[in-house]
């Protein structure tokens, strides 16, 4: 299920940039986020998530980058689909094997 993004990528980038630029003026990252989030109209946790994601994407923080995360999701979907196809093939194989066995027994 896809959710609609309330904030455009430009707004997100600008908000993250504001946090990064003003981070030194606050005692912690959270304090900077709490101060800036109301100015753009989002909750602090959302802005913190954006900042952390940007830090991961730029290599400043450990974790999967956005592109790696998207690739992982695509691979997980593919694995799920392949497993489903494999189950269908197993069922069909068992069906045809039984049909062949029945045919041989009748002959």
UniProtKB/Swiss-Prot annotation:
Q: Which GO terms describe its molecular function?
A: DNA binding; transposase activity
Domain of life, per lineage: Bacteria
Q: Enumerate the UniProt keywords alphabetically.
A: Transposable element
| InterPro entries per the UniProt record, alphabetical | Homeodomain-like_sf, Transposase_8, WH-like_DNA-bd_sf
Q: Name one GO biological process term.
A: DNA transposition
Q: Which SUPFAM superfamilies match?
A: Homeodomain-like
Family (UniProt): Belongs to the transposase 8 family.
Name of the protein this chain belongs to: Insertion element IS401 uncharacterized 12.4 kDa protein
**Protein species of origin:** Burkholderia multivorans (strain ATCC 17616 / 249)
